[in-house]
Each structure stands twice: as structure tokens, then as C-alpha cells.
From Swiss-Prot:
HAMAP family: HOA. Residues 9-261 form the Pyruvate carboxyltransferase domain. The record marks R17 as: Transition state stabilizer. This is 4-hydroxy-2-oxovalerate aldolase 2. Substrate binds at R17, D18, S171, H200, Y291.
Amino acid sequence: MTFNPGKKLYISDVTLRDGSHAIRHQYSIANVQAIARALDQAKVDSIEVAHGDGLQGSSFNYGFGAHTDLEWIEAVAEVVTHARIATLLLPGIGTVHHLKEAYEAGARIVRVATHCTEADVSRQHIAYARELGMDTVGFLMMSHMTTPQNLAVEAKKMESYGATCIYVVDSGGALSMQDVRERFRAVKDLLEPSTQTGIHAHHNLSLGVANSIVAVEEGCDRIDASLAGMGAGAGNAPLEVFVAAAERLGWNHGTDLYTLMDAADEIVRPLQDRPVRVDRETLALGYAGVYSSFLRHAEVAAEKYGLSTVDILVELGRRRMVGGQEDMIVDVALDLLER
């Protein structure tokens, strides 16, 4: 397709959802309002708000949040005037009832997330979101785990259920730039021209920004990113870095770079109890193709059982574990202990 460098990119911030993983879902109300105010002032298009694992993610399996999803959403709704509030729903964790509550609290966009080969389970939630009048997005996680052609078939299912935008989601931060290019070409070949596409990158191989740029070159409309890369694993594509790169490329991003830079360093980075960066453990996620939010859980298991976090993560990758199988991390640790 012909690349249009002048089109307005849709900047989708995920600091208050994916970023929640980086601090074990412990954002205070004051934290979320300070971050949301800065993002709103910088004129991002949307701000995603939820537990890291989406609506109703607060649980023994994923980690309990400092507040409920609704408390966080309502807090953000009080302070934003420009950005629209988005939320994330994983069918089986959140239900249509939780989605309605999120809508009533102020969310107007929902990203319905499934494993990249399980779009079928999103039908009810996508259809219901459309009934509510929400901007409805299909979110295909762990997109490195299937072929571009299969990914396109799953994307087409989500489109048929009513999603008007489909995301290629690199949950493991394992995609190369060529991988991204091939997936966008396959997906866009099957989808209607009116259906938008989005990229959600992770930075585990330091390719978060590069992969987002490649996606835009392939006609991607929406770009997920977070302040200071705040997110699972080595984090997401850092928002201020992507915007600076887009500015250098002459792309129309519509946001204020300096406001984003200040918010990243002054508000977000000080909250990190573990640096969000590429290091031995987060690099193992990208190398082994492991769901990025497994990081903190694997670190806890490694400390408890006297193991190497890297060994646990690489074994999880070998077993092709996917999002939602956090309970298997301890099983893997116990198996490694017996070797």
C-alpha cells in the first residue's frame, strides 16, 4: 500500500494499564491522575486504564490491584478533557457486565484481547461493546506465535464480529521488524480498507520503537506506547521516544514532545521499584518469546526457590506458555528444582 507520511497518527497511551505490570498494579489514585493530566495536556488521543491484565484482572493469579478498575477509570475521567478513556478486556477474566460498568465509569474505547489464535472467544464481548457504542478494538496478543497468514484469519474474525480496528500485539517483545512488516501486510490484505490497524510493541529486544515505525510505514493507524516505556518486561515502546522519532521523520503525531518527556522523567520513572529496561531477565523474555507480564511473577518464583529467573523464563518459552498461564510459573520452577 502507499505510505502517507502526512496522515494523523492515533497515539494510544498504555501507561495506566500495561504500565501497571511494572509496579505490580499498585498505582495510587494520585498517581493515575497526575499521569492522566500530563498525557491529556500533551494531547494523546487515548489513555488506557485498567489492571495490567484488564478488567477484573485483580486476582490471586495475576496480582491484586491497589484499587479497582472502576476507581482508576473514574479518577482519570475526572481530570481529562481531550483524550478518550480506553480499557482492556480479556474474555474469561472480564465479562460484558464489567464492560458495562467501565463504560458507565467513563471508558469509551475497549480493546478486546485474546491469544493470537483464539479470536473466536471475543465474539460476545466485541458485539456487546458495539451495542454500547464503544470504539471497539480487537487485540491479538502474542502475535509472534502464529504465522502472518493465520494472524490475518484471526483478525478477519474479529472484524466480522464488529471490531473496527485490529491490533498486532507483540506481547513477548519477540517480533523483528521483518516479522512486523509481514504481519501487517497479511492482515491488511484480508481486512476491509475501512478497518483500522494498530501496533502494540514491547521493548524486550530494544525494537519497540523500530517495530512501531515499520508498522506505520505499512499503513498502521494506531500506535500504543507508554511514558518511559512503563509496561511489562522491558516495557512498551517509550512514548516520548516514538514521538521524537516521528517528529524527526516529519510525521503528524499531534502531541507535545516536551510535555511527554517531562512526564516520563518527573512522574513515571520515580514510580518504578524495578527499572523498566532491557536487562538479563527482560532480554530473556524477548529471546524466548515469553509473555512480558510473566517477568515479575518469575522473579518471585526464582527468589523463593533459589533459581535463576532467566532459566525459568527460557523454560516457559520452550513450553510455549501464553498469557493467562501465570500459575504454571511455579510448576516450571518446581520442575527445574528436580533436575
